[in-house]
Each structure stands twice: as C-alpha cells, then as structure tokens.
Amino acid sequence: MDKRIFGIETEFGISYSSPDSRPLAPEEVARYLFRKVVSWGRSSNVFLTNGSRLYLDVGSHPEYATAECDDLAQLIAHDRAGELILDDLVDEAQARLAAEGFNGTVYLFKNNTDSAGNSYGSHENYLIPRRGEFSRLAEILIPFLVTRQLIAGAGKVLKTPHGATFAFSQRADHIWEGVSSATTRSRPIINTRDEPHADAEFYRRLHVIVGDSNMSETSALLKVGTVDLILRMIEAGVIMRDMRMENPIRSIREISHDLTGRALVRLANGRQLTALDIQREYLNKVTDFVATNGAHNAHVPLILDLWQRTLDAIESGDTSTIDTEVDWAIKKKLMDGYMRRHDLSLDSPRIAQLDLTYHDISRQRGIFFLLQARGQARRLVTETDVKDAVDAPPQTTRAKLRGDFVRRAQELGRDYTVDWVHLKLNDRAHQTILCKDPFRSVDERVDALLDSMG
C-alpha cells in the first residue's frame, strides 16, 4: 500500500500529590478529569471535533485514540494534540479540586508503567489489505517488534534483585504472548482480534500492542515508519529469512536489559543471533527494497538514516549521535549527567523521579518539554501543527467527515451518535450513514446531512 491509514492509542498514567489534603485514588481523580467531558458528551467515551476518540479505559487510565491519519507527520501532530487536550482537562480538574478544598496537584504521564508495577499501553494501528495470510505477516513482524525497542524504546530504570539497571523498554517486561485476541489479560505483541473499522472485504487492521509511548517525535516516526516499510515489503512479496524466535517473550526481556544490543536470541531453527543482527537484517532488506522501488513518502530517508545511526550508536556504545532523537538515549544522557553532577547512583529516588517526570505531559513541568524548548530534543512538527490538530481533523481521511459532523451537531445542540464508521442524528428518523472507506474524506451523503442540519 502506497497510502496507509495509521492511528495511535495512548493510555496515560494518572497521579495526585496531596501534602496538605486527603489523598485521592486514581479513579476519583479520573472522574474529576472527565467531569467536563461528561457534562457535554453525557459519557466518558466521546469523539472530538478533530476526529479522535477520548475515553476512560479500564480502571482509571484516560485514553486518547488519534483520528485516522495517512501521513506520519500528520499522525505525530495528532498524537501530540492528545497531550494538549488532556493537559487542558488537567488544568480544569485542578481548578475544580481547589474549589472543593483539595490543594494537591494532578499529574498525567505518557509512560507505560507505574510505581506499583502496573502497565498501560501505547497501541499502534496499521491498515493492511485483507488478502494474504495474517499468520505469515505476524511471523515476519514479531522478530522485528521484539527487537524494535533498540530503536524506539522509551527507556526505563528497572529495579531488580541485583540493583537498578537502565533498560531500553518500559513495556517489554509486561508482554506475555506473541499473538492473541486479548489486549489486557495476556498483553500480546500483536492483537489478532479482527476489527478493521473499514470494509472487511478489502481491509484488516494490524493492532500492535508491544510498543512504548514516545515523547520524542523522531522516536515515534521511527517506531511507526519502520513497520510501514516492512509491511510494504511483505505486501510486495519480498522473501525474508526465517527469524522466528524460540521464545519471543523471554527474548524481549533479555534484549531490553542489555544496552549493548548483543543479547543472544535463539531462533526456532536453532540458530543464535544478537538483537543488533536481527535489526540489521530488517534494515538491510528495507534499504534494498527502497533502492529498487523508491521512497513512497518524504519521511523515508530520515527513517532509514536514523535507523542506521541508532544501530551504529548501540554497537559502538557512543550514543552522542542520537541523544536528541531517540527517547531512551535522550533519557539516558539526562540521567547520566544528573548522576554525575549530584554524585548519585541509578537506584536513587531522585533518578526514579527524573525517570517519571520525563513523561509528564505538562508543557510547563515535563522534563522532556524543557529539553525540547532548549533544542535538546529534535522536532518534526511545529507547535502550530499540533495546536491546529487539537480542533481540526486530518483533511485527507474519513476523520474529516466525522469531525465536521461532530462539530456541526455540537454547534446546533443536536443529539447524535458517532463511532469510527457510523454517523447518526438521534433526533430524526435518518438512516445511519456508514463510512467504510477510511481514505474517503468527501462524501455526498455526509454533505447532504450537514446541509439539512441548517
């Protein structure tokens, strides 16, 4: 597919610090956070004017699912927009709590684990053709996804019985299966539940569960862009070496804990390769494919360059060439400098706080955003792009139809029902409009409905 629909679903960690008032459970804080949403949407599960979905997931985790995007920069802008939307909700919840005598502080974190050992996810969605064997696609992708943490991990200080260690990935120690139709119970690498949110005759949705939430825009580009390139290669029928792993769940943990990239992975055929070997195999295949077929979008040269530089940096042990572009390397540089200046070890509570605050979505408090403001974290999209994406849907996908409908219905105070594929006014006997083509941003049926609303 030269054009593909992408989406990212992000679950956020929530916390409340209250030195002078009674503590609040995360569930209570989440209710304050969503009170404004419930007041206008009559639900904690709503679609917004930018085409995205905002809701409370299992327990107390706010979740933001981007609108359908067909460009990687567009995807990153809309993912970033979710942070701004939720940060605004934090400010309003903070004011409401203060009015009720609660003087603590609400925090939202774009990370994947909390201090109690709970994990919450960042899920990627890729539209793929229905034709072809899904099991074969999963077999080819899983070795890549197990080792992708080298280039796209968010980094984490991991507490072990032998002391603290720095790991590539936050999510790796919480994955329990290769493929599964469940997302919370078994936490697979790839979710196989067949919900395309599109015409099921032609499309399927690849739902990747294993990734970390990225603060870095270039890390997010690398995470999604590499999968897109490998999918194109598979769709073109390129033959890949058999790199199925004997035990991908054990391997994903061992790889995460070894920053040299040389952790050995035993393959199902008995061979042993390092994580770096496996990543280089995919990189070389993709590079050859692009050399033969050309780059299908303007982001491909940067994706290939950063992929190469990241693997080279891991192999050499010198991450200075990537420490403004790859989350784990940005975070490690930050921590190494802080430990050196303050004579601390990795198991210091101050380092644990630094690890957490890196993921604070507050533009005023969050350490990542302080680094970004100083030019120490590379940008791909402008702040104007992000602010535009808070209100406006992507103009080139089905999200435009949904966003325009939601906006008009809200402006006119009309009662409506909407999801990824359906649009309906509840206060008249209109037939539900079914939008099964996610690439279609113009639809005369939707135009007629909007015109009829006045």
From Swiss-Prot:
EC number, UniProt record: 6.3.1.19
Pfam families: Pup_ligase (PF03136)
Keyword terms: ATP-binding, Ligase, Magnesium, Metal-binding, Nucleotide-binding, Ubl conjugation pathway
Class of the enzyme per the UniProt entry, highest EC level: ligase
Annotated catalytic residues: D57 (proton acceptor)
Reactions listed under catalytic activity: ATP + [prokaryotic ubiquitin-like protein]-L-glutamate + [protein]-L-lysine = ADP + phosphate + N(6)-([prokaryotic ubiquitin-like protein]-gamma-L-glutamyl)-[protein]-L-lysine
MF terms (GO), sorted A to Z: ATP binding; ligase activity, forming carbon-nitrogen bonds; magnesium ion binding; ubiquitin-like protein transferase activity
Pathway: Protein degradation; proteasomal Pup-dependent pathway; Protein modification; protein pupylation
Residues at which ATP binds: R53, T66, W420
Disulfide bond positions: none
Note: The reaction mechanism probably proceeds via the activation of Pup by phosphorylation of its C-terminal glutamate, which is then subject to nucleophilic attack by the substrate lysine, resulting in an isopeptide bond and the release of phosphate as a good leaving group.
Function: Catalyzes the covalent attachment of the prokaryotic ubiquitin-like protein modifier Pup to the proteasomal substrate proteins, thereby targeting them for proteasomal degradation. This tagging system is termed pupylation. The ligation reaction involves the side-chain carboxylate of the C-terminal glutamate of Pup and the side-chain amino group of a substrate lysine.
Protein name: Pup--protein ligase
Biological source species: Paenarthrobacter aurescens (strain TC1)
Gene name in the database record: pafA
